[in-house]
Swiss-Prot record:
It comes from Cupriavidus metallidurans (strain ATCC 43123 / DSM 2839 / NBRC 102507 / CH34) (Ralstonia metallidurans). This is 6,7-dimethyl-8-ribityllumazine synthase. Pathway: Cofactor biosynthesis; riboflavin biosynthesis; riboflavin from 2-hydroxy-3-oxobutyl phosphate and 5-amino-6-(D-ribitylamino)uracil: step 1/2. SUPFAM superfamilies: Lumazine synthase (SSF52121). The lineage of its organism: Bacteria, Pseudomonadati, Pseudomonadota, Betaproteobacteria, Burkholderiales. Gene3D superfamilies: Lumazine/riboflavin synthase. It catalyses: (2S)-2-hydroxy-3-oxobutyl phosphate + 5-amino-6-(D-ribitylamino)uracil = 6,7-dimethyl-8-(1-D-ribityl)lumazine + phosphate + 2 H2O + H(+).
Amino acid sequence: MDHGFYESNLDGEGLRIGIVQARFNEPVCDELREACMAELKKLGVEGEDTLLVTVPGALEVPLALQKMAESGQFDALVALGAVVRGETYHFELVSNESGAGITRVGLDFNVPIANGILTVDTDAQAHARTREKGRDCARAAVEMANLVVALDSLREHGAEDAEDEEDDE
């Protein structure tokens, strides 16, 4: 049996990307955003095809993503933030709940979400990861937006094939 293969597609032309950035740990989050926006531009996503909103912290990110997803105006979304471990259990709570919320929104609304919420032990670790993570999120958002379109077309072709089979009967 011969199997098909879908090449990853990093062409961002015409894609609409929504970005939700947490403001807590703002210098780190600003670096994430700058790297993400620069990479989106390199991939062909126009500035007017992006919408950036900011929220207080990582726990507020999922709700903003949900509202963007509900609008149906975005091909992909990006979550940006930084959770730095402190001396209390709060780190685990924020890390786990923000991640679970982001995943749930993507699955509930069938929209790709690149999760760029850094979870690190120190500010130095966060700063060391901002450029690469911001860039990677842009690439993941574009690639997954294109993949969803390609996979949705499989469903459309499957429906057409089923109709053709019914017509043949």
